[in-house]
Amino acid sequence: TEDTVRKNAEYMAAHLKDYGWEYIVVDIQWYQPTAASHDYEPFADLVMDGYGRLMPAENRFPSAAGGVGFKPLAEYVHSLGLKFGIHIMRGMPRMAAHRRLPILGCDATCAQAANPNSICAWNPDMYGLRCDLPAARAYYDSIFQLYASWGVDYVKVDDIAREYPHCAKEIEVISAACRACGRDMVLSLSPGPAPLEQAEHLKRYANMWRLTDDFWDSWPQLKAMFGRAEKWCIHAGPGHWPDLDMLPAGAIRQVQSPEEWTHFTQAELRTMMTLWCIMPAPLMFGGELTKLDAFTLNLITNR
């Protein structure tokens, strides 16, 4: 919710900004009024504008009222000296295609650009796009121009990083739209495992890409990260960073169990943080910042 985003941004500005933490990212389903858990609701009603572009659910993000989108929330985050990001799924809402909504900037409809055979296996909200058609580029241009108008600094595109070879062209079209939108944005691709043989393609078209599926507080998962980091570390450099996923530290699983803490021991947390830093991989914190304990705060600030 907007309240959660604002409180975490305020905490980051007060306690973490001086140590290099700078992005506040709104995760999945911000456009679904009924989203209430980590389970996806098949064929839920999603909030869109007249061009099939997803908009924040106003019951959860009240500053978006009146069709202004995330602009007020992004402005607040920027006022704290931080940057603002969002999560999206690749493609367009299936609702937009079924309603044959127009695509901004061209004569085609969403139905003409959609690929009904390209659907995420775990979230049925979207259709992939027919990226051989100009209408697909026009749609992606329209959403990135919208995000630029909101003041978005970071876009995480899901259901794409491991979907080679059939999503290679879609990655290229998304990248082109992002670069042409008139605002500098980090382009992050998920989920993994991204294929190692596509490293040069990923470095050319994205800033970050996930090496794994969702990473949780499990020692076997953490141990496996060493092998992935060893293979990918040579591809890390300015502008292109292999991503080991968020750090599952502190208070996580807040929807299911608000009092639950990470299952990692302090030794495992030190191991995780050390590996991410020596690779180096992007540091994205996955817990509730306002509940940080002294150990975790010291760990992620290296104090």
Regions found by a protein language model. Name each.
Residues 1:
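An acidic-aromatic substrate-binding cleft motif
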Residues 4, 8, 12-164:
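Aromatic-lined carbohydrate-binding/catalytic grooves of carbohydrate-active enzymes
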Residues 5, 66, 140, 167, ...:
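Active-site-proximal structural scaffolding
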Residues 72-73, 143, 174, 274, ...:
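Residues within well-ordered alpha-helices
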Residues 99-103, 169-174, 202-203:
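Short low-complexity, flexible loop/linker segments enriched in glycine and/or proline
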Residues 113-118, 131-132, 138, 142, ...:
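Glycan-recognition surfaces
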Residues 143-193:
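Extracytoplasmic, non-cytosolic globular domains
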Residues 284-303:
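Glycan-recognition and catalytic regions of carbohydrate-active enzymes
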